[in-house]
């Protein structure tokens, strides 16, 4: 038989047993929560273990796996993504923004090697693509501003010429200044006279002096200073004459001056490539070459030199002449100068004057690629020797 509850409903087997109203105060029994909606449950819950030990619940021990911590990546990548997302969001807002930009070019290198694409940003600001990465610190050199006094002091130091540029410089003969042929350069400078311009006196009708009664008054003369007396007694200064241009000197005048002066002077004498004279004899054996014939026999053939090579060997040069007197200089009454080399006559004329310095240097080379250079003197004049064709033709017709 099944028992019913207070409400008259049958109880299910194995379910919680209904409590009676009279059993509310029993010890160790927890009443079931009332089903009436108007009643609240008790604040303190009752224990059904009847004072026994609580049952332990066992939980499995899970072994935690150790994971090796990897170094964190730089946060700059996230920052770049955030900046790009912001730029994309900004481009979408507003009117006329975020439009695609098209750049047309004919070649790859048309914009130049250092030209970079520029992206249009907000607030009408151009942003380089290179600026999208992490910002780098740029050290800007600060220029020091000079005051007016420092600038004036630098100019004074530049204008100075009373100091030695090299403090360790010593007086050495090898460091002497170069001499240039500017002895007649004084005519380039203009000198002004200190005396005021005096108008020339024009001769006119002679005027008669008017007779005037001279009063008998004597003027007392004051003593003069020594400087004034010295100026009065000093002779007048001679007027400086500006040197004129150097005169064109003929060969005859030059040779006469050189014969009268005691100082020795070097002359540059230009001679023809080929000189009259006998070239030195050279014992040269003929060159023989072996040629194999059709029959297999070897034949020796002498090779003769070309005509030009023979003429070059028969020519006489200055190096082929012996040391000593080469010829004679003849000075005619007309001023013509000739050089006699055996039976050949050469005309001697003045060469073109040089505007630079010429020196005769003797160079002596050693075996170990070293040598010495000795300056023998300055060369001031140049003489050119050319063949006299009239005398050559007369000598040929004879």
From Swiss-Prot:
Any single biological process term in GO: innate immune response
Keywords of the record: Acetylation, Antiviral defense, DNA-directed RNA polymerase, Immunity, Innate immunity, Isopeptide bond, Methylation, Nucleus, Phosphoprotein, Transcription, Ubl conjugation
Keyword Cell division: no
Entry-annotated residues carrying Phosphoserine: 42
Disordered: region residues: 1-114, 220-244
Compartments reported by the entry: Nucleus
Keyword Phosphoprotein applies: yes
Post-translational modification: Sumoylation on Lys-141 can serve as a signal to mark misfolded Pol III for proteasomal degradation.
Biased composition (Basic and acidic residues): 66-100
Subunit structure: Component of the RNA polymerase III complex consisting of 17 subunits: a ten-subunit horseshoe-shaped catalytic core composed of POLR3A/RPC1, POLR3B/RPC2, POLR1C/RPAC1, POLR1D/RPAC2, POLR3K/RPC10, POLR2E/RPABC1, POLR2F/RPABC2, POLR2H/RPABC3, POLR2K/RPABC4 and POLR2L/RPABC5; a mobile stalk composed of two subunits POLR3H/RPC8 and CRCP/RPC9, protruding from the core and functioning primarily in transcription initiation; and additional subunits homologous to general transcription factors of the RNA polymerase II machinery, POLR3C/RPC3-POLR3F/RPC6-POLR3G/RPC7 heterotrimer required for transcription initiation and POLR3D/RPC4-POLR3E/RPC5 heterodimer involved in both transcription initiation and termination.
Name by which UniProt lists this protein: DNA-directed RNA polymerase III subunit RPC4
